[in-house]
Amino acid sequence: MCALALVSVIPAAQARGHHHSHGHHGTPWCGIYLSHYLGKQDRNLALARNWAHEGAPAPGPGVGVVAVWPHHVGIITGQAADGEWIVHSGNDGNAVRTRPRSLAGVIAFRYVS
């Protein structure tokens, strides 16, 4: 319920140009989901790219590190046997998923508490 309340306050201009599926109100929701998942109350984190400034910089991927792409955000939860990182995120195929994911294109790795 809390996540739905955040959806209504995101300006439409922020949602433009997002290549992932949009939720019920036409809003990209990966940032909203991660905010809820991590217990964050900052509306600015609804936009994936804004996670690039949250917390502290991490030197690279690792379990518990937030990975930020230009239009997506998720948290690394493990590493597959082949070395690919496992990422938990919302709005991954319009669903919440935990799966191996390429980190190509990541613009920031962040420690977020």
Give the residues covered by each predicted segment.
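Aromatic- and glycine-rich peptidoglycan recognition patches
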Residues: 14-22, 79-113
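Catalytic cysteine-centered active-site loop
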Residues: 16-63
